Amino acid sequence: MRLEQKKVAVSVPKIFLEDRWDHVNGASHNSQLFRVTLDTFEPIGRKQASLQNHNGIHNRMTFVVGDRVEQEALASIISRRADPGTGNVGFENYALERSDHHLSKAVLVGADPQRNVYFTLGENGVPDTVVSCWIAGKVPFPGCDQYFRASGMDIKVNYRAYAFQNWQKIQEDITRFLSCAVEASKNKDI
């Protein structure tokens, strides 16, 4: 992970890795993409995802494991992107209101907000989780992006907006998966 200048070793079953270059033992990557079902966390390949799209089935998420800027800077970037025309407003300048699903919602002040932005805050007031969802009617198929850290890595998750209410389960499933992947790498010679 380039920004933090560190590596996190993981070991996952090959079925989760689509690309041949990901199957090389000891390979080092700056990021890794996974695609799984929302309900059972089973891996889904590109062909299967394409077929599901064709049939109107969207019960899946993708997540990228990598390295990004600090969560507070990320929260500011996501908020500004959702609230165009507000200039260089930082996360700390947005008022937060209570929202459903144990989240706080940013009160966007721009003339035409594009997304709703939600947060969970850590003890120090810095966002632990950022969830950004398209506002219905702004795009044909609204989705959500969710950002958090797990096992020393930054995670970006993407799923359809209907799954937003399950954001905690999604985060717990990914956290458990990555925790197992890190632990498995300690038990192997990588």
Can you describe what each PLM-predicted range is?
Residues 6-8, 127, 153:
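Short acidic/polar mixed-charge low-complexity motifs
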Residues 90-140:
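Signature of long, low-cysteine stretches enriched in small and polar/charged residues
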